[in-house]
């Protein structure tokens, strides 16, 4: 799966089956979505979303001050864009605070 871009957000969505649950992985400070790449193959019976937080990896730099609210809004924009209604959220370090 190659990286996709939406309004400056960089993400990968491994959609396998509409009946599968979706897991969203959020990386920690100073990292990017690649830290979760090895997890994707472990969840063969799930759809998986990994993405770069604003100011990280290939996502754009934030226009204003960085905050947890800004990161939460970014997640909402991505899940609304790809029409995910329910998901399991897994975060590491900063990603666990969103």
Regions flagged by a language model, labelled:
Residues 4, 33, 39, 74-77:
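Residue-identity detector for glutamine
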Residues 1-23, 44-47, 80, 84-86:
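Alpha/beta-hydrolase fold catalytic core
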Residues 15-60:
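Conserved HGGG/HGGXW glycine-rich cap/lid loop of the alpha/beta-hydrolase fold
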Residues 49-90:
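Active-site loop/oxyanion-hole signature of alpha/beta-hydrolase fold enzymes
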Residues 91-95:
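Gly/Ala-rich beta-loop-alpha elbow adjacent to hydrolase catalytic centers
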């Amino acid at each position: 799966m190659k990286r996709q871009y939406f309004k400056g957000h960089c993400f990968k969505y491994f959609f396998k089956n509409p009946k599968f649950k979706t897991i969203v992985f959020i990386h920690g400070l100073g990292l990017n979505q690649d830290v979760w790449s090895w997890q994707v193959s472990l969840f063969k019976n799930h759809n998986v979303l990994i993405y770069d937080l604003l100011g990280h990896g290939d996502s754009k730099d934030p226009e204003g001050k960085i905050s947890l609210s800004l990161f939460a809004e970014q997640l909402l924009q991505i899940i609304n864009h790809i029409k995910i209604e329910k998901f399991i959220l897994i975060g590491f370090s900063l990603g666990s605070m969103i």
